[in-house]
Amino acid sequence: MAERDARHLSRRIRLTTPHWNVTIADSDGLIIGRPDAWFDDVGLAWEIDSKAFHYGPRDYERTLARNSRYAAAGILVVQTLPTRLRDSPEAVARELKKAHRAAAAHPRPPVRVVEPI
């Protein structure tokens, strides 16, 4: 449900078309993450992080480690709760647009998609 809402929102706001659920690696080939949406043109990751899958003790540790890998690689990340996507899509749209502009204002991080797009 949340990913369907995210896809609908991304089409509606007309940013570059994101790639969905692709694996991102750094220049050494080390896996950084698998964002729900990846805006390859600017190196922006969008994660739809539900409490059910990210806030158990081990899940939370993995989420923090993932976010640290994104930061170390220079990737800007937008994190959205599914409930916020459902209840406040306009606010989420504004955040995505601003984040896309912010990412575009900097050199694209030296990362690549390691799965076919």
Model-derived segments and spans:
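Surface segments flanking catalytic/ligand-binding clefts of nucleic-acid enzymes
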Residues: 1-117
